[in-house]
Amino acid sequence: MDDENGLELSLGLSLGGTSGKSKARDAPLEPKAEPQVEESSSKGVSQTPEAPFVHYYQTNAENQEHSSKQRHSPAAPPFGNFWGQPGSSSVPVADGSNEQKPVSSKRKLLSEEISFQKKPNTAAEQPDAFSKSSDGGVKNAPISISTDDGSTGENEDVAESEAEGSNSWLVAQREDSAKGSVVNRGSDRKRSSDDAAVGFQGKRQPSFSGSESSSGKLPQGNPLSLQASNVVAVPYQVPSQVSAPPSITNASNFTPVCTVQLRPPTNNGLAVTMGSTSQVAFGYPAVQLPTLETSSSWAFGAPPQAMSSFTAKDKVERAGISQADDGKKTQEAGASSSALVEDDKKSDRALPLMGSAIRPGIAPNVKFGGSGSYPDLPWVSTTGTGPNGRTISGVTYKFGRNEVKIVCACHGTHMTPEEFMRHASADAPGQENSATLPAFPVGNQAASAQN
């Protein structure tokens, strides 16, 4: 359509041939349109970017002639050429010579700012960018119209209409992006389900994310129909078909992370072997694995079948130490008893030298003072000769290698066997009346005998 001056008012329709030709021809004249063309072509978007139109209308005669030539130019190219050449530039630029420069930022209309600020990110992520609208028509960028004479009343109306068109274009593009995201999500879910079908066969493993996995669900009748025959660490709870280890009974609120050995299924079922030898899968024999104590508060009541090697070693060492202690005690007891026997033998050896006057044992009429008698000591007794002779008793002990002395029980005097016999003879009353020898000593005769 033309105004009163005969100029063509081109609204940037993609099907218009005259404006398309002039725009394609004068595209290098606009320095600001080049980075936008490269950006749109790199993103694969067939939409026309919002480039500032500078001095679209020229009032000189030369531009009028040029516009008249454009009116008589051939029709628009066919749709096949338009859609088949995605690399061809469809950027609308202004006609004119190289002397025309872009206007200042005051001339930029509201549609350009809205399109640059509120452009959705989904248009840059998806390669097709939904170049068609919902009704099949091609979306066009808004056009800024400015004149040299400064008449902006008409341009303001155009700017308002273009702003409304840009807003509707943004809404339509968001709806298309939402539809595309739903389609892509469905395709991704289908692709992940296909990956999960071949995941346990060694090709690919499914990725579990979130509370619900996006991969395909396994059938309930056959929970894990696996073909791999290797050891798999299961980070989740094992199904009820898998038997628990025999050393631990089933307890509530206890989900152990166990190692299950998976084998090929038999008769369309799951063949999972987990018995008493399942602990060997960790790389250690069953004897070296520590077990739970039944006496603790958190035990499961079952007696442990596998004993720790450290516990067994400690028990063996303790048994050896106890046996060694018992051996030492028996040896000490045997040594002490043998020492007593040897002392008895030595005393017996010394006694025959003294004759039959000194005999082993204690006299029945001996009176003890202090702590009483000690029958376990090597007691000997003798009876003195003469009118003043009496029976006395004493304790023998080894004084030297071949000498034995006797401590009398009446006075606690250490003497030789000969002196012990004379002490029981006639000189006994004189010693009893003597002040140096008390009749009944209060001291311990056993202690004096050991000293």
Swiss-Prot record:
UniProtKB keywords: Nucleus
Biased composition (Low complexity): 207-216
GO biological process entries: jasmonic acid mediated signaling pathway; negative regulation of DNA-templated transcription
Localization: Nucleus
Residue ranges the record marks as coiled coil: none
Region (Disordered): 1-223, 321-346, 427-451
Claim: Nucleus is one of the keywords in the record: yes
Biased composition (Polar residues): 38-49, 86-103, 143-153
Assembly mode: Interacts with TIFY10C/JAZ8. Interacts with TIFY11A/JAZ9.
Protein name, as recorded: Protein NINJA homolog 1
Organism, as annotated: Oryza sativa subsp. japonica
